[in-house]
Amino acid sequence: MSSLHRIFREVSSSGETSPPELARLLGLELSTVSAKLRTLVQKGMVEFRDGRKRVGLNPTFGYVVGIDLGGSHIHYALADFRGETLCESDEKIQPEAGPAKLIRQAQKGIRTLVARLPRHGRLRAVAIGVPSPVTPNLGVVTWANNLPGWKDVHLKAELEREFRVPIFLENDANMAAIGEHWRGVARRVENFVFIALGTGIGAGVFVNGKLYVGRTGAAGELYRMNVEWPRWDEDFGDTGHFESYVSGLGIAAEGHKSLDTKSGRRASGLREERDAYFVFEALRQGNPRAREVLERIFTMLGVGVANIVAVLDPDLIVFGGGVSKGAPDLMLATVQKVVRKIQPDPPPLKLSALQDNAQTCGAIFSALGLAQDSVARQLA
């Protein structure tokens, strides 16, 4: 590994440093470091700051796109080589349109962002979070319950053919966990679980500072967890036992059973987490039945969290997703009460600091890592 490669790697990981600090960390002569930094500056990869006392990545050396593909929308973000977001856009999708049409829509959205780059700006990587397990290393969407027809879709390969840059694909909850670890409440936390509560439920797991995806990429797929052992052999279909209760869909369904909504909507037709908001609104208006519904569901969530704690013993549990914002105080209090009852030494429970931006933030970080790895290999 060349000294040029090592210096670039250290500048990338530190964000900003100084020549003397680089020399100390890498065990190199200061004169060697200074000469190599001048080479990296000439290549446009890094830049001196504060009168050459500091050095950091050149933000204009390249750009990345981070994408959050949800069950009802696609959110795009364009960031520079230092990870600063430059612009964002959001589009609605038709989930039933099928993979081919949605992939074309995503490609068009990426091209629209790339068209906004400076004249000599270069796209260097794209990362995308999807509502599905992803086959490790292959970037194959295994199955996406909220996107009909998305089974064994080779999304990574499709995007690589179109843009000729490195592509990273990951489950949406995992991507949110990456974002939270980069710039959220889990920053510098080695072992934590991010629980995403939206239309469905999922989790991203960090062990020893690294994302854990499991044998098939399905680690954290909480929707099939069962917390009612007498019903262990019932078939809950693609929804799964846990998700049929502990999710936006579950809250909406239970709300329609217990509250006089006068909406005429059937629970089976509900698709979005916003359909649970009428339960949260009823709670804010003092409806006791709404409180009963939510306490019952949050108690079930607490049992699930206690099981996670028993298996992983994490340092922190983070809650994110649209549903986590509906009644955060009641949710945290109920879950905490249940977990403390079951576990003698439970970890702290916190709400996501990034909320709706967690997945996009994780995608930007992942794309940056890809871009920087690609550049570093050229210097090895």
What are these regions, as identified by a protein language model?
Residues 81, 122-241, 245-256, 362-380:
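Phosphate-binding/catalytic loop of phosphoryl-transfer enzymes
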Residues 1-50, 56-122, 162-163, 229-233, ...:
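ATP-binding/phosphotransfer module of carbohydrate and carboxylate kinases, centering on a glycine-rich
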